[in-house]
Structure formats: structure tokens, C-alpha cells
């Protein structure tokens, strides 16, 4: 039943007769909820493979990095900074970024930080789905215009913590 609902949602949003017109797909790779991240990345990979079209995967933190950097004091902008998120009962997830000439450089992928770690400067995750989706589509357009290959097989979800505890 859930699979059928997802298929209908995809077909309603993008009818199959328009699929050949796709020039590329894009997906946020996380971090995010385990099930949601896994399902969206797998769905995007499957569609890209079956439609033989490029797939751009970008971490959720990299998508929000340009807007979160603006919260830092002017003197710190352009320097490396951390994006962090406290996970109840798990710890703090953090990734390190630097914005130069409008480009996001992901210096450290989001990962579970050692207990007690407090990287600085740091900005707390702030969700803005509309802004992040717009940025993701903008990055897809730029990558496509630049002729980037964007193979689907290289797009993997980011899991900074295990859904089954310590592994």
C-alpha cells in the first residue's frame, strides 16, 4: 500500500510521459531521519538509473551552509565554520564548511562528533525546506550547464548515526 501511494505521488507530480524530458535529478543526501533519507536517496538513484539521467546528491548541511554562514560575525564569514545539530540520546552531529566566492566547500561531512566536542565557530541547523530545495535545483542547473557527469552510483545517503545503536 505505501509503495503504491509513493508511485501515485510520483506519477501525479511528474507523469511518466514527461520522464524522457528529464535532463537530471537532484536529491538531498542527509543527514536526516534514517527512513526518509534512505527512501528518498534510493528512489532518486533508481529513477536516475532507469531513466538514464544524471543524479546530483548534496548533503543537507551543504545546502543550508550559505544561509547559515550569514549568522556569523562579518569577520568570520569566508572562514571555516561548523553546522551542528543536537540529537536527543545520540549526541551532536556536525559538519565543517567554508564558503568562498559563492562556492560551498564541505571540509568535513556531517558525522557524530566525539562526546563533549564543541567545534567553533558553530551554527545550529535551521531547516528551511523551500530555500534548500531551491538551492538544490540551482546546483543541479549549474552542474548540468557545466557538463558535470553526475553518475547515480556515486550518490549515497549520509548516516552520521546508526539506527541500531553503536556499531
PLM segments and residue spans:
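Glycine/charged-rich beta-loop-alpha catalytic/anionic-binding loops adjacent to active sites
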Residues: 21-27, 121-123
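DPxDG-like acidic metal-binding loop motif
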Residues: 24-60
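Local beta-strand N-terminus motif with an aromatic residue
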Residues: 6, 22, 78-81
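Oxyanion-binding and handling regions
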Residues: 56-167
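Conserved beta-strand segments that form the floor/walls of ligand-binding pockets within enzyme
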Residues: 9, 26, 82
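Phosphate/pyrophosphate-binding loops at sites that engage ATP/ADP/AMP, CoA/4′-phosphopantetheine
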Residues: 11-24
Amino acid at each position: 500500500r505505501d509503495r503504491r501511494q509513493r508511485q501515485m505521488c510520483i506519477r501525479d507530480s511528474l507523469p511518466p510521459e514527461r520522464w524522457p524530458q528529464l535532463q537530471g535529478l537532484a536529491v538531498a543526501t542527509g543527514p536526516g531521519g534514517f527512513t526518509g533519507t534512505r527512501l528518498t536517496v534510493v528512489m532518486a538513484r533508481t529513477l536516475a538509473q532507469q531513466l538514464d539521467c544524471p543524479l546530483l546528491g548534496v548533503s543537507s548541511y551543504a545546502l543550508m551552509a550559505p544561509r547559515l554562514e550569514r549568522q556569523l560575525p562579518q569577520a568570520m564569514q569566508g572562514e571555516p565554520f561548523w553546522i551542528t545539530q543536537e540529537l536527543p540520546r545520540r549526541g551532536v552531529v556536525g559538519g565543517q564548511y567554508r564558503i568562498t566566492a559563492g562556492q560551498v566547500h564541505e571540509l568535513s561531512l556531517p558525522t557524530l562528533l566525539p562526546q563533549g566536542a564543541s567545534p567553533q565557530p558553530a551554527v545550529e541547523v535551521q531547516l528551511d525546506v523551500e530555500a534548500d530545495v531551491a538551492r538544490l535545483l540551482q546546483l543541479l542547473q549549474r552542474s548540468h550547464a557545466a557538463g558535470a557527469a553526475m553518475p547515480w552510483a556515486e550518490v549515497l545517503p549520509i548516516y552520521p548515526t546508526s539506527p541500531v545503536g553503536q556499531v
